[in-house]
Amino acid sequence: MKRFLCGVLAVLLLVALCACGTQETATVRLSEVTHSVFYAPQYVALEQGFFADEGLKIELSNGGGADKVMTAVLTGQADIGLAGPEACIYVYNQGKDDHPVVFGQLTKRD
Protein backbone atom coordinates (compact mmCIF):
# COMPACT_ATOMS: atom_id res chain seq x y z
CA MET A 1 0.00 0.00 0.00
CA LYS A 2 2.84 2.37 0.84
CA ARG A 3 4.45 1.78 -2.55
CA PHE A 4 1.21 2.49 -4.35
CA LEU A 5 0.59 5.68 -2.42
CA CYS A 6 4.15 6.76 -3.13
CA GLY A 7 3.53 6.08 -6.82
CA VAL A 8 0.32 8.11 -6.85
CA LEU A 9 1.99 10.94 -4.97
CA ALA A 10 4.92 10.85 -7.40
CA VAL A 11 2.48 11.24 -10.31
CA LEU A 12 0.76 14.11 -8.58
CA LEU A 13 4.08 15.78 -7.81
CA LEU A 14 5.23 15.35 -11.40
CA VAL A 15 2.05 16.90 -12.72
CA ALA A 16 2.32 19.76 -10.22
CA LEU A 17 5.93 20.46 -11.16
CA CYS A 18 5.02 20.68 -14.83
CA ALA A 19 3.02 23.81 -14.04
CA CYS A 20 5.76 25.59 -12.07
CA GLY A 21 6.54 29.07 -13.28
CA THR A 22 3.32 29.59 -15.21
CA GLN A 23 0.20 31.50 -14.30
CA GLU A 24 -1.96 29.75 -16.87
CA THR A 25 -4.11 26.76 -16.00
CA ALA A 26 -2.88 23.53 -17.58
CA THR A 27 -5.39 20.77 -18.25
CA VAL A 28 -4.33 17.20 -17.51
CA ARG A 29 -6.61 14.40 -18.71
CA LEU A 30 -6.37 11.48 -16.30
CA SER A 31 -8.05 8.15 -17.02
CA GLU A 32 -8.28 5.51 -14.31
CA VAL A 33 -9.16 1.87 -14.80
CA THR A 34 -11.88 2.11 -12.11
CA HIS A 35 -12.74 4.23 -9.11
CA SER A 36 -10.88 2.67 -6.19
CA VAL A 37 -9.90 3.35 -2.61
CA PHE A 38 -6.29 2.98 -3.80
CA TYR A 39 -6.63 6.36 -5.52
CA ALA A 40 -7.84 8.05 -2.32
CA PRO A 41 -4.92 10.55 -2.17
CA GLN A 42 -5.81 11.70 -5.67
CA TYR A 43 -9.49 12.14 -4.79
CA VAL A 44 -8.60 14.10 -1.65
CA ALA A 45 -6.25 16.35 -3.64
CA LEU A 46 -9.00 16.99 -6.20
CA GLU A 47 -11.64 17.75 -3.58
CA GLN A 48 -9.34 20.00 -1.55
CA GLY A 49 -8.34 21.97 -4.65
CA PHE A 50 -4.62 21.17 -4.40
CA PHE A 51 -4.28 20.82 -8.17
CA ALA A 52 -6.14 24.06 -8.83
CA ASP A 53 -3.84 25.83 -6.37
CA GLU A 54 -0.95 24.77 -8.60
CA GLY A 55 -2.64 25.91 -11.80
CA LEU A 56 -3.82 22.47 -12.87
CA LYS A 57 -7.24 21.45 -14.06
CA ILE A 58 -7.64 17.68 -13.77
CA GLU A 59 -10.17 16.01 -16.03
CA LEU A 60 -10.73 12.65 -14.35
CA SER A 61 -12.46 9.88 -16.27
CA ASN A 62 -13.25 6.26 -15.55
CA GLY A 63 -11.79 4.27 -18.42
CA GLY A 64 -13.80 1.16 -17.72
CA GLY A 65 -10.90 -1.28 -17.91
CA ALA A 66 -7.17 -1.37 -18.56
CA ASP A 67 -7.54 -1.87 -22.32
CA LYS A 68 -9.75 1.19 -22.66
CA VAL A 69 -7.42 3.28 -20.48
CA MET A 70 -4.43 2.27 -22.61
CA THR A 71 -6.35 3.06 -25.79
CA ALA A 72 -7.19 6.51 -24.42
CA VAL A 73 -3.52 7.19 -23.67
CA LEU A 74 -2.30 5.90 -27.04
CA THR A 75 -4.87 7.90 -29.01
CA GLY A 76 -4.24 11.11 -27.08
CA GLN A 77 -7.61 11.16 -25.33
CA ALA A 78 -5.82 10.92 -21.96
CA ASP A 79 -2.48 12.31 -20.83
CA ILE A 80 -2.03 9.84 -17.96
CA GLY A 81 -3.55 6.39 -17.53
CA LEU A 82 -3.82 4.60 -14.20
CA ALA A 83 -3.93 0.88 -14.95
CA GLY A 84 -1.94 -2.28 -14.37
CA PRO A 85 1.45 -2.83 -16.00
CA GLU A 86 0.17 -5.67 -18.18
CA ALA A 87 -1.50 -3.18 -20.54
CA CYS A 88 1.87 -1.52 -21.17
CA ILE A 89 3.55 -4.90 -21.66
CA TYR A 90 1.02 -5.86 -24.35
CA VAL A 91 1.74 -2.66 -26.29
CA TYR A 92 5.50 -3.03 -25.82
CA ASN A 93 5.40 -6.63 -27.11
CA GLN A 94 3.76 -5.40 -30.32
CA GLY A 95 7.06 -3.70 -31.16
CA LYS A 96 5.70 -0.17 -31.16
CA ASP A 97 8.32 2.59 -31.28
CA ASP A 98 6.27 4.86 -29.03
CA HIS A 99 5.11 2.68 -26.15
CA PRO A 100 3.85 3.71 -22.70
CA VAL A 101 6.10 3.54 -19.65
CA VAL A 102 5.19 2.12 -16.25
CA PHE A 103 6.51 4.41 -13.54
CA GLY A 104 4.74 3.07 -10.48
CA GLN A 105 3.13 -0.16 -9.38
CA LEU A 106 1.30 -1.52 -6.36
CA THR A 107 2.31 -5.00 -5.29
CA LYS A 108 0.62 -7.04 -2.61
CA ARG A 109 2.55 -9.79 -0.79
CA ASP A 110 -0.19 -12.28 0.03
Positions of the model-derived regions?
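Short, low-complexity disordered leader/linker segments with a strong preference
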Residues: 1-27
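Short, glycine-/small- and polar/acidic-enriched structural segments
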Residues: 24-110
